[in-house]
Design a protein with these regions (language model features):
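Jelly-roll (double-stranded beta-helix
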Residues: 1-245
Length: 245
């Protein structure tokens, strides 16, 4: 099967807008449903959310899902039924394992400034695990401009936080102008431009904030920052339905 490189532009994402929320969906989510756009590899959700001051998501349930949150600006307060609570901000990675079931809320911790974050969902490779929570500060690790593994379940990975899927890993990089990184080689890879502008090797047109690229497979291509940029990269060695067992 030939390799595919599917560039998805920011303007083509699904949108949910309320009085307090502006959410842009890379995949089907909520009222936005496209049967041809439900996931890529193991990644089910890649939501780019902005929440108004003092607002947020009231307590709601999740089950059998690994949920990773990465804040781009502001501060997000988390509280769940397992007794975990905390405030996450740029440079601090968070993972919540829903497992057999968990309730949680997410609120903007500021009364004056919005909070902007990306939330990503990956199915675990084993259902019915205990709910769990982990967060870790990785700001310093991002200073060198290289891809850093911040969340992984893959054997041999030294990640800041763990996820319960041995076929998936999330990498993050903050790139200075003209810095380049080589993307991991994997059967499935999802690149999301959290901020900035980049050039993708052997592709026409720049990648801008909110754009995404879906590789199947990826083959170690390079991306170069045209301006200071931040990228989120999911490396996946299975597709939905093939990693459970």
């Amino acid at each position: 099967m030939p390799a595919t490189v599917d560039i998805r532009r920011a303007a083509d994402r699904g949108v949910t807008t309320t009085s307090w929320l502006n959410s842009r969906h890379s995949f089907s989510f909520g009222d936005y449903y496209d049967p041809a756009n439900t996931h890529h590899g193991l990644l089910l959700v890649n939501n780019d959310d902005e929440v108004a001051p003092a607002a947020g998501f009231d307590t709601h349930p999740h089950r059998d899902m690994e949920i990773v949150t990465w804040v781009l600006g502001g501060a997000l307060a988390h509280r769940d039924s397992a007794g975990n609570h905390g405030v996450i901000y740029p440079g601090l990675a968070q993972r919540m394992s829903a497992g057999t079931g968990i309730l949680h809320s997410e609120k903007n911790d500021s009364t004056t400034e919005p909070v902007h974050f990306v939330q990503m969902w990956v199915a675990p490779d084993t259902s019915g695990i205990d709910p769990g929570y982990q967060q870790h500060q990785i700001d310093d690790a991002l200073l060198d401009g290289r891809l850093q593994i911040i969340a992984s379940g893959m054997p041999g990975h030294d990640a800041a936080i763990t996820i319960h899927n041995r076929y998936a890993a999330l990498h993050v990089a903050r790139l200075r102008t003209n810095n380049a990184v080589e993307l991991p080689a994997a059967p499935y890879l999802h690149l999301f431009v959290a901020g900035g502008t980049l050039a993708l090797e052997d592709a026409q047109g720049a990648l801008s904030t909110g754009d995404a690229v879906r590789f199947a497979p990826s083959e170690g291509r390079r991306v170069t920052a045209v301006e200071p940029s931040e990228i989120l990269v999911w490396e996946m060695h299975a597709a939905l339905g093939s990693s459970r067992g």
